Amino acid sequence: MKAAITATAKYLPQSVLSNHDLEQMLETNDEWIRSRTGIGERRIMNDPSKATAYMCGEVALQLLEARKMKPEEIEVIIVATMTPDMLFPATACFVQGIIGATNAWAFDINAACSGFLFALSTASRLIESGAHKKVMVIGGDKMSSVIDYTNRSTAILFGDGAAGVILEPSTNDNYGILDARLYSDGASGTSHLLMAAGGSLNPATHETVDKRMHFLHQDGKQVFKSAVTSMADVAAEIMTRNNLSAEDISFLVPHQANQRIINATAERMGLDQEKVYSNVARYGNTTAGTIPICLAELNEQEQLKTGSNLVLVSFGAGYTWGGIYIKWQ
């Protein structure tokens, strides 16, 4: 038994933060940002009363509507996020409450930008085992809550957003999620992309706030190098393991870190740009939200046909990275 995606949905805040807006806040300009990242604008959740759980809840409600499913039918809810509303309870529990999924059990996965792929793979195993038949998987982040908007190197990259899918048993074992390769490197990856404070090691104090330790920190050059290598390697591995040529692939759906990383991954796979889905110019990096937002847009645009071969690849803090092969049902 394989797991197949039977519904997609996305939520993006209405407020837009453009490169021209950032010019008023930082020593930067539109050309500089576009040439280095490919990003033109990003969405920001400006309402301080709404955060990741709200966005994921909106996605969950849309998923139920798209599948014409009652909330009581959902058996498991998995939310991938690195910006939970609170350290506990889990964001997934808030989502469960929002939609009234009284029969579900719910938990979060934090694998940063790789979170959605880690959650999707976990959910597919729950389906394949026969333990569950209706699993909701959502990736979302309110990155604006952890970004230092006085830091040019990170302020330009990130946006807010969420998206997700419903997984159910495939009607044919030749379709659905057919392969997944997931990796972590805690030996060398933990110091290059992180938020140092807010956990049990550095709980909030006046000192941690003054030192700006509650914002995302990134060693940009090292992360770029590692992301290009890791995403390209895992994409090549997925292709080799499943005897896929560049011609066989309908779409590469990469994590939307920046356009240069996306282009380098596609080049390694030998893919033409028309087979590479990218919306980083419009939304920036929404971390756990990037890949499911892409899937939702592809589905909305009716570009996904029965038998379409999709390769999903990601890279994130930890380091974490992975690839998933889906034959669309």
Swiss-Prot record:
Main location: cytoplasm
Keyword presence, Cytoplasm: yes
Molecular function in Gene Ontology: 3-oxoacyl-[acyl-carrier-protein] synthase activity; beta-ketoacyl-acyl-carrier-protein synthase III activity
Lipid metabolism keyword on record: yes
Subcellular location: Cytoplasm
Enzyme Commission number: 2.3.1.180
Residue segments, region ACP-binding: 256-260
Enzyme class: transferase
Residue numbers annotated as active site: C113, H255, N285
Reactions mediated catalytically: malonyl-[ACP] + acetyl-CoA + H(+) = 3-oxobutanoyl-[ACP] + CO2 + CoA
Pfam families for the chain: ACP_syn_III, ACP_syn_III_C
Pathway assigned in UniProt: Lipid metabolism; fatty acid biosynthesis
Record keywords: Acyltransferase, Cytoplasm, Fatty acid biosynthesis, Fatty acid metabolism, Lipid biosynthesis, Lipid metabolism, Multifunctional enzyme, Transferase
Cellular component GO terms held in the UniProt record: cytoplasm
An example Gene Ontology biological process: secondary metabolite biosynthetic process
NCBIfam families recorded: fabH (TIGR00747), PRK09352.1 (NF006829)
Domain remark text: The last Arg residue of the ACP-binding site is essential for the weak association between ACP/AcpP and FabH.
Functional description taken from the UniProt entry: Catalyzes the condensation reaction of fatty acid synthesis by the addition to an acyl acceptor of two carbons from malonyl-ACP. Catalyzes the first condensation reaction which initiates fatty acid synthesis and may therefore play a role in governing the total rate of fatty acid production. Possesses both acetoacetyl-ACP synthase and acetyl transacylase activities. Its substrate specificity determines the biosynthesis of branched-chain and/or straight-chain of fatty acids.
Subunit structure: Homodimer.
Family: Belongs to the thiolase-like superfamily. FabH family.
Name of this chain's protein: Beta-ketoacyl-[acyl-carrier-protein] synthase III
Lineage, highest ranks first: Bacteria, Pseudomonadati, Chlorobiota, Chlorobiia, Chlorobiales
